[in-house]
Design a protein with these regions (language model features):
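ATP-dependent adenylate-forming carboxylate-activation enzymes
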Residues: 20-21, 41-57, 68-70, 183-203
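Conserved AMP-binding A3 loop
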Residues: 118-145
């Protein structure tokens, strides 16, 4: 996926807006954007078109990822700002994953400084329009390492992940701590109490 993004012109410092469902391919997009040196901007997949337009115009992404059913309605605003648009659906299929077998498995990461921007998250907008909050690579790394130490997470742990992945706790806390500690993840796409209770039998952590 990193090769595909780079081939589309995504480079260090560019923003990639990801409005796709919770699936492992969306997580791959997050990791791929970090490898390319881009700024990852996850967006609530349930936002309306008008809400989405605001975030596009304000963040000015280079690439936008959404479900195929939304491409037609979002494309005009992307064309207006010169943003490329690709599809990714809940089953992991779409333009993002098409043709990956023809690309090299190895991607040399673009070097980034610890204070370079890694991710962009918007506030809820309770006092006005949502505002972009900037997270650096050092922000993400230091946060994950502190929590790994505080919670004593290691490779023997298995995390129940039942949160959305478009906000801090569901993406940066849960995913980063698991990846950096070597822990496993039981990935529940939509919260379901029966699935969560069943997962208790095989897990040591829940977020």
């Amino acid at each position: 996926i990193s090769h595909k993004l780079a081939n589309l012109g995504l480079k260090s410092g560019d923003r990639i807006l990801v409005k796709s469902p919770k699936c492992k391919e969306t997580l791959s997009l997050y990791l791929s954007s970090i490898l390319t040196g881009a700024v990852f901007f996850p967006l609530n997949s349930s936002y309306t078109l008008n809400e989405t337009i605001y975030f596009i115009e304000d963040s000015k992404p280079t690439i936008l990822i959404c479900e195929s059913s939304e491409v037609k309605s979002i494309k005009p605003i992307c064309d207006k700002i010169g943003c490329k648009i690709l599809s990714l659906n809940a089953n992991g299929e779409g333009e993002v994953t098409n043709g990956l077998e023809d690309l090299d498995n190895f991607f040399k990461p673009n070097n980034r400084a610890k204070d370079d921007l890694a991710a962009l998250l918007y506030t809820s907008g309770t006092t006005g329009k949502p505002k972009g909050a900037m997270l650096t690579h050092q922000n993400l790394v230091s946060n994950a390492l502190q929590l790994i130490n505080l919670w004593n997470i290691d490779k023997s742990d298995t995390l129940i992940h039942a949160l959305p992945i478009y906000h801090t706790h569901g993406l940066f806390v849960a995913i980063n701590t698991s990846m950096m500690s070597g822990a496993s993840i039981r990935f529940i796409k939509n919260f379901n109490i029966d699935l969560v209770i069943e997962a208790f039998k095989f897990s040591t952590l829940m977020i």
